[in-house]
Amino acid sequence: MRIALTTVQAPFVSGGAEFLANNLKKALIDRGHEAEIVSIPFMDSPTYLIENHIVASRLFDLEHSWAGKIDLCIGLKFPAYYIPHSNKVVWALHQHRAAYDLFDTEYSNLKSNEDGQYYRNVIYNADNLYLKEAKRIYTISENVTARMRKYNRIGSTALYHPCPDAEKFYVEGYEDYILMTSRINITKRQMLAIEAMQYTKSNTKLYIVGKADNVYEKDRMLAYIKELKLGNKIKYFDYVTQEEKFKLYANAKAVLFIPKDEDYGYITLEAMESSKAVITAKDSGGPLEFVEDGKNGFIVDPTPKEIARAFDEIAMSKNLAREMGTASKKHLLEMNVSWDNVVKELTR
């Protein structure tokens, strides 16, 4: 089949969504399909752009291209999953969360005022109307499925996929550091992890890896480490190569991933591919679908002292990191998270 993958992109910004689209394209091509990513630019600030983008998405025609008929359209992101097609399935990374669970919070630019309520309703109504055009709706996790059911009463099926370069992760050992890899962003809660290091009793260190969304976020984080006098306990890597990242995973004691209500979270899968326990929080969303508390990681309250307790428990035990890490890899294999399964479902 000739398949179009519809998504959006903020120019010069790249992350998990771009990884997913590229890897889905490769998976489809590897299995005999023709596939192309159709990406449209997106900005939600100022807020009037939201409505413009929705209207623009409805004006595209993807039934044909100069190459011929397009057999299937797979919609990935708001509002590109509104693009019309007679044979469309949606595999939603997430909805526009600023209008849903993040509305009127520090994580959203839509507030509980006349302007915010207007654009929230625009998004609600568009999702309710246009998502139902799809022949089938999938999401990337049970967390996203639950949100869609809660806010829109739209049913969907969770369809898990592997993290990028899954086959390149490996395990070497369990050295005395906890690894935290995420872009530096308020929703990833690096500040909470830093604060937790005040309360650790073990000698374990925290390695933070990731580029900041902006200079302010990075400067704020580094200033906080300095303010708490934790420079000897925390190491920050602004940039690492892929090979360096694999090695950091391979030798970590465990992996910390405590985002606020994550949709999916490649970091969980990267840790499990590397045979590492995952320390996550009770409100972290996606990771909770993979982590079993006390078996292949810890699920803790999102407080500094509880996170520190988990650090110390795994750091002070001789064998716990290895035992949990082994269980982590085994659990991932049992879940059959594979591109074969994804392609089979999306193209059936």
Segments from the language model and where they lie:
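Conserved donor-binding/catalytic core segment of Leloir-type glycosyltransferases
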Residues: 170-188, 194-201, 206-208
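Short hydrophobic beta-strand element within catalytic cores of glycosyltransferases
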Residues: 277-281
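Nucleotide-activated donor-binding/catalytic signature segment of Leloir-type glycosyltransferases, i.e.
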Residues: 218-240
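Aromatic "clamp/platform" in nucleotide-sugar-dependent glycosyltransferases that forms part
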Residues: 260
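Short alpha-helical donor nucleotide-sugar binding micro-motif in glycosyltransferases
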Residues: 239-240, 247-252
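Conserved acidic donor-binding segment of nucleotide-sugar-dependent glycosyltransferases
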Residues: 292-294, 298-305, 313-318
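A short, well-ordered alpha-helix in the C-terminal region of glycosyltransferases
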Residues: 306, 313, 320-335, 341
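Membrane-proximal helix-turn-helix segments that form the acceptor-binding/catalytic region
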Residues: 108, 113-137, 145
